[in-house]
Amino acid sequence: EAVFAFAERMNEKAIEIGAVNSHFSNPDGYFSPDHYTTTSDMLKIAKEALKYDNLRETFKKRKVTYKITSGQTMTFNNSNRLLNPSNPYYFEGATGMKTGYTTESGHCVIASAKRNGVEIIAVIMGGTTSNGRWADAVALLEDAFALHELTAPTTAVPAA
């Protein structure tokens, strides 16, 4: 019942933010025939999630410990290699967000990074290898930041 209620609310929110090519049937992202999305919709959802400071802070942590209602604590390790300075895929300025893998969807990541006040989000889905997902994320982020620098507005200079 809780899973159904979550999915119903998630689908409503997705439509509200313009993620109209998705349908969610569970909160964990595992395969279900009626659970699907697109890279474009995931970008919209990621942008929405980053509006919430508590989520933004959680996404960038390498480890999070929560106290659950029973009083027990649970620790979650973030598998985002872009956040780990000792990993070859470390990305300076990485801020999160979410990794995933299923046989059906392949290796996926929503990767965010911020440099010089500019935040970029890259969405990779359907990767054939875990390392490939990280290499693609780094390449997309590097290219996006380089493109932004090339096209960033400059200070106007008076005409002679």
Model-flagged regions — what are they?
Residues 1-159:
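Penicillin-recognizing serine hydrolase domain
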